[in-house]
């Protein structure tokens, strides 16, 4: 991912500054605007602006938030930390947010190695995996990249599935020139695949399990809207 690459490359540059550069279009891949989640391939040319190196600005996350996250931890080992991320809480700072889950945990555990192995949308709740050392981060990143991690989400959908199991294989992209616009199905988009399984129906609504075989931004809602 572009953001992970830049964090590694621009050591000492605050993450908030890196995400701001991406969001404002200052970072380009092969001459085109990029997203934080853009995947880099061998031979890609990445253009970045001059960046001032300085320590991260201190972040002060409220004690009640940090307590909530401590209570949300589901599993912990010397390599991993897994917690049930609450809906409405971003995983990292950026886009006008001064802190995220990773910042709160780092404040709560000063001096510990903690890195996000993946991301969840701000409004999505569920299992968030963090690495507790560099080797674990490398292995987890490879598993997410290679698709060996199974990602399943429970969703309440407005409308009914036409069948008990529906595969949506439709490319996704934002509207041209809109870095923060909605993600929609577009022929020129990135390959995206979601499998919806019906769990229960409630009149005009249904409760489904959505399994992601790709990891595009807003993939579930875009594919659900496409059914």
Put a short name on every predicted segment.
Residues 1-227:
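RNA pseudouridine synthases
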């Amino acid at each position: 991912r572009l953001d992970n690459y830049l964090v590694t490359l621009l050591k000492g540059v605050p993450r908030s500054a890196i995400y701001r550069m991406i969001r404002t279009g200052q970072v380009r891949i092969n001459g085109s605007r990029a997203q934080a989640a853009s995947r880099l391939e061998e031979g890609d040319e990445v253009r970045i602006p001059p960046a001032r190196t300085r320590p991260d600005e201190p972040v002060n996350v409220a004690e009640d938030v940090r307590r909530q996250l401590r209570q949300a931890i589901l599993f912990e080992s010397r390599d991993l930390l897994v917690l049930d991320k609450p809906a409405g809480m971003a995983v990292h700072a950026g886009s006008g947010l001064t802190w995220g889950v990773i910042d709160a945990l780092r404040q709560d555990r000063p001096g510990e190695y903690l890195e996000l192995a993946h991301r969840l949308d701000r409004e999505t709740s569920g299992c968030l995996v963090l690495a507790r050392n560099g080797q674990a981060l490398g292995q987890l990143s490879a598993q997410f990249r290679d698709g060996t991690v199974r990602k399943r989400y429970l969703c309440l959908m407005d409308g009914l599935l036409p069948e008990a199991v529906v595969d949506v294989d439709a490319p996704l992209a934002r509207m041209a020139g809109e870095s923060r616009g909605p993600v929609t199905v577009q022929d020129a988009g990135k390959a995206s695949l979601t499998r919806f399984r019906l769990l229960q129906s409630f009149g005009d609504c249904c409760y489904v399990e959505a399994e992601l075989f790709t990891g595009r931004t807003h993939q579930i809602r875009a594919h659900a809207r496409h059914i």
